[in-house]
């Protein structure tokens, strides 16, 4: 995680495969998402919240406990909040990301989105809102103490942008 100070308070950038919780007034969490998903979870009575940022749906097939996978990431975030005194019945969840930013057919963004929604419902948590899917990346801002999320879309979806032009020159063979 990267912690920054600004005039408006502390900003913590939650990177892929990380999670962070806080109840510090003025602290803000942020992440940049493509096909990854972030859950922002908040207990309004305790004024505590957190954010995760997972890359892959489900469980780690090698059972390493990595929070890069949705199941472990979601469980770890909720457990950390409960450990600090949050009440599962009061937890509000917002889900973001899961885009198809590269225009490929892998479906990882859709799989991440479906996993996050299914997990939230299966755990009996309140899904307050979501902004999932599409073709554009997002920057998510979340204030854990107040539970206020905000999303900014990336400027270009990048799908129609060429990655590189043709390689080689007449008479040159590339291998």
UniProtKB/Swiss-Prot annotation:
Catalytic reaction list: L-glutaminyl-[protein] + H2O = L-glutamyl-[protein] + NH4(+)
Organism: Jannaschia sp. (strain CCS1)
Protein name from the UniProt record: Probable chemoreceptor glutamine deamidase CheD
GO biological process: chemotaxis
EC class: hydrolase
Molecular-function annotations in GO: protein-glutamine glutaminase activity
Keyword vocabulary terms for this entry: Chemotaxis, Hydrolase
EC number of the protein: 3.5.1.44
Chain's role: Probably deamidates glutamine residues to glutamate on methyl-accepting chemotaxis receptors (MCPs), playing an important role in chemotaxis.
Family: Belongs to the CheD family.
């Amino acid at each position: 995680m990267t912690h920054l100070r600004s005039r408006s308070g502390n900003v913590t950038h939650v990177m892929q495969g990380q999670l962070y919780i806080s109840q510090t007034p003025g602290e803000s969490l942020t992440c940049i998402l493509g096909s990854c998903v972030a859950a922002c979870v908040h207990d309004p009575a305790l004024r505590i919240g957190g954010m995760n940022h997972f890359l892959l749906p489900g469980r780690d097939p090698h059972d390493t406990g990595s929070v890069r996978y949705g199941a472990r990431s979601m469980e770890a975030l909720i457990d950390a909040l409960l450990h600090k005194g949050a009440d599962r019945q009061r937890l509000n969840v917002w889900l973001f990301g899961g885009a198809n930013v590269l225009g490929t057919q892998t479906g990882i963004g859709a799989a991440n989105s479906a996993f996050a929604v299914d997990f939230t419902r299966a755990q009996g948590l309140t899904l307050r809102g979501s902004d999932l899917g599409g073709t554009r990346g997002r920057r998510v801002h979340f204030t854990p103490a107040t539970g206020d999320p905000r999303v900014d879309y990336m400027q270009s979806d990048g799908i129609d942008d060429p990655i590189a032009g043709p390689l080689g020159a007449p008479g040159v063979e590339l291998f």
